[in-house]
Amino acid sequence: MARQATKLIANLSKKLSSSNPHTRCSEQTVWIGAAPPAVFVDKNTRVICQGITGKNGTFHTEQAIEYGTKMVGGVTPKKGGTEHLGLPVFNTVEEAKAETKANASVIYVPPPFAAAAIMEGLEAELDLIVCITEGIPQHDMVRVKAALKKQSRTRLIGPNCPGIIKPGECKIGIMPGYIHKPGRIGIVSRSGTLTYEAVFQTTAVGLGQSTCVGIGGDPFNGTNFVDCLEKFIADPQTEGIVLIGEIGGTAEEDAAALIKESGTQKPVVAFIAGLTAPPGRRMGHAGAIVSGGKGTAQDKIKALKEAGVTVCESPAKIGVSMLEVFKQRGLV
C-alpha cells in the first residue's frame, strides 16, 4: 500500500508540473454573498474530511459538527455512496467538491498515505487543506512541497499540526474548542500544546482570539510564520499577535524580519521553546533540532527582540505579557 501511495504522489506531481501555471494561478475562488476569510477560515468555510470513516476522522468530525463547523461530507476510497455521521461519503475529493461545494479539507489519514491525500486535494483545487497526520515520510513531503510551489490556488496547513480555528465560527483540527473565545489576539504556533496554553491564557485575561493557526513542527510544512503574520497584520479583528516558536530552522528569524519590515503597530508577544536543548538532538518535533550552529533559541530570541517583539521567558507568562502591552498602549 505504501508503494502505491508513493507512486500516486509521483504521478500527481508530474501532472501538476505539466499543467499551465499561468492558467492555474489566474483562477479565483468565487465567494457568493461573502468576502473571503481574513485569515484562511470563517463561518462560510465548507469542509470535507479525508479519512472520515476512520477512528480519528469520526471522532474529530463529530467534534467539528458540534462546534458549528460546516462539515459537508467525507472521503474514503471504496465507501462512496454511503453515509457517515449523517454526511455523504465519496470515493474521491474531486467528487466530494463537485457535490458539496466544499472549499476546504481536513486529513486524518495514516502516514504512508497522507501525502497522497494532500496531493488529491491539490488536484481538486481546494482553497485550504489541513493535514493533522504526524510521521509522514520526509521524502513524500518534499514532493508535496514541490507541487505546492507550482500553484497558487491551494494552501496547506500542516502536516503534524493541531489545525486552525476561528473561535465561534469554524474549527478544523484536533484542538479543544471550549477553551477558545472570540476576541482580539491572533495566535500562530509550531507547537500544538503550547498553542492551547496561549489560548487558555488569552481567554483568561479577557482578550480572546481572532484566529489560531497551528503550523506544525515538521521541517517541510505548507504554511509558515510569515504567511500567518501577513494575514494577522492585515486583519482588522486581530489587534495583537502571539507567536510560539521552537529551536530548529529559521522560521522565527524570517518572522522577525517581516515584523520589522512591516512596521506594524500591533503588539507581538513570543515564546521560543528549547532554550536548554543540546545541539544535534531532536526535541519532540522532527524540525526541532539545532544543527550546524543554526536554529538556536538564543538566535531566535535576539532576532525577535530586535524587531520589537516582547519575548516571554516562560510560556506561563504569555497571556499576562500581552495584557500588560495592551495596557501600556491604552488598548484596554
Swiss-Prot record:
PROSITE patterns tied to this protein: SUCCINYL_COA_LIG_1, SUCCINYL_COA_LIG_2
Primary localization: mitochondrion
Pathway annotation from the record: Carbohydrate metabolism; tricarboxylic acid cycle; succinate from succinyl-CoA (ligase route): step 1/1
E.C. designation(s): 6.2.1.5
Known tissue expression: Expressed in roots, stems, flowers, leaves and fruits.
Domain of life from the UniProt record: Eukaryota
SS bonds (residue pairs): none
Keyword Nucleus appears in the UniProt entry: no
Alphabetized InterPro entries for the sequence: Cit_synth/succinyl-CoA_lig_AS (IPR017440), Citrt_syn/SCS-alpha_CS (IPR033847), CoA-bd (IPR003781), CoA_lig_alpha (IPR005810), NAD(P)-bd_dom_sf (IPR036291), SUCC_ACL_C (IPR005811), Succinyl-CoA_synth-like (IPR016102)
UniProt KW Mitochondrion keyword: yes
Annotated binding of CoA, by residue: T53, G54, K55, N56, K79, I132, T133, E134
Catalysis: reaction(s): succinate + ATP + CoA = succinyl-CoA + ADP + phosphate
Active-site residues annotated for this sequence: H285
Cellular component aspect of the GO annotation: mitochondrion; succinate-CoA ligase complex (ADP-forming)
Top EC group: ligase
Keyword tags: Ligase, Mitochondrion, Nucleotide-binding, Transit peptide, Tricarboxylic acid cycle
Compartments, record wording: Mitochondrion
Transit peptide: 1-23
Matches recorded under SMART domains: CoA_binding
Summary of the function given for this chain in its UniProt record: Succinyl-CoA synthetase functions in the citric acid cycle (TCA), coupling the hydrolysis of succinyl-CoA to the synthesis of ATP and thus represents the only step of substrate-level phosphorylation in the TCA. The alpha subunit of the enzyme binds the substrates coenzyme A and phosphate, while succinate binding and nucleotide specificity is provided by the beta subunit.
Record's subunit section: Heterodimer of an alpha and a beta subunit.
NCBIfam families named among the record's database cross-references: PRK05678.1 (NF004230), sucCoAalpha (TIGR01019)
Homology family: Belongs to the succinate/malate CoA ligase alpha subunit family.
Name of the protein in its database record: Succinate--CoA ligase [ADP-forming] subunit alpha-1, mitochondrial
Biological source species: Solanum lycopersicum (Tomato)
